[in-house]
Amino acid sequence: MALDPSEQHLRHVEKDVLIPKIMREKARERCSEQVQDFTKCCKDSGVLMVVKCRKENSALKDCLTSYYKDPAFYEECKMEYLKEREEFRRTGIPTKKRLQKLPTSM
């Protein structure tokens, strides 16, 4: 059974696992300042990080949650996923491998 590369239907695993994974990655990039602050606090605090890093943890959670709840952000990530899936269905090469196999000139 050949799959239509441009088909827009999403399977359960795509909606509930793969697209949220892209959302997490992109949200972490966009909240990089809060991620860095929280990471630094945890490294500096050691065992007491649970108590000492509450402010940084709250700021990070607020930033990430704002993206997770944004319907436009979900649509952006969904379209990115559909584009990658379409490319995979046309070429048979996963995105990560395609990016790794780019020729380098020296």
Swiss-Prot record:
Paired cysteines (S-S): 31-63, 41-53
Domain of life assignment: Eukaryota
Motif Cx9C motif 1 per record, residues: 31-41
Domain CHCH: 28-71
Keyword Lipid biosynthesis: no
Entry keyword Mitochondrion: yes
Recorded GO CC terms: mitochondrion
Localization of this protein: Mitochondrion
Residue positions, PTM N-acetylalanine: 2
Gene Ontology terms for molecular function: metal ion binding
Keywords: Acetylation, Copper, Disulfide bond, Metal-binding, Mitochondrion
Chain span(s) of sequence motif Cx9C motif 2: 53-63
InterPro entries for this protein: Cyt_c_biogenesis_Cmc1-like
Family under the similarity heading: Belongs to the CMC family.
Subunit field text: Component of the MITRAC (mitochondrial translation regulation assembly intermediate of cytochrome c oxidase complex) complex, the core components of this complex being COA3/MITRAC12 and COX14.
Summary of the function given for this chain in its UniProt record: Component of the MITRAC (mitochondrial translation regulation assembly intermediate of cytochrome c oxidase complex) complex, that regulates cytochrome c oxidase assembly.
Protein name stated in the entry: COX assembly mitochondrial protein homolog
